Amino acid sequence: MYDVITVGSATLDVFARTKFSELIKIIDPKGETDLLAYPSGSKILIEELDFTTGGGGTNTAVALSRLGHKTAFIGKLGKGTNSDFIHKELVKEKVALL
């Protein structure tokens, strides 16, 4: 028996870390915001890549598992390296796959 069963997406998120960016301020009628900007058409040195699981279904299941709930996930995983990574991460986070 599970405390929570989530249904949803399972994705692989990739975060690229670099020092070659700048913040620019955009002002429009709704207010102002800062955006992360890179030079158009240029190559950017990526210092580190981080791979994590993402998607509403898996993120919710992992978060609740970390809070001590017994969780399971229902969703579609394909075949291949990315799916293997997601599966291993969910097992590591104590999320059952149904």
Language model: regions and residue ranges:
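Alpha-helical transmembrane segments within multi-pass membrane transporters and channels
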Residues: K76-G78
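Glycine-rich phosphate/adenosyl-contacting loop at the front of the ribokinase-like
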Residues: M1-I74, S83-F85, K92
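A glycine-rich helix N-cap at a beta->alpha junction
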Residues: E89-L98
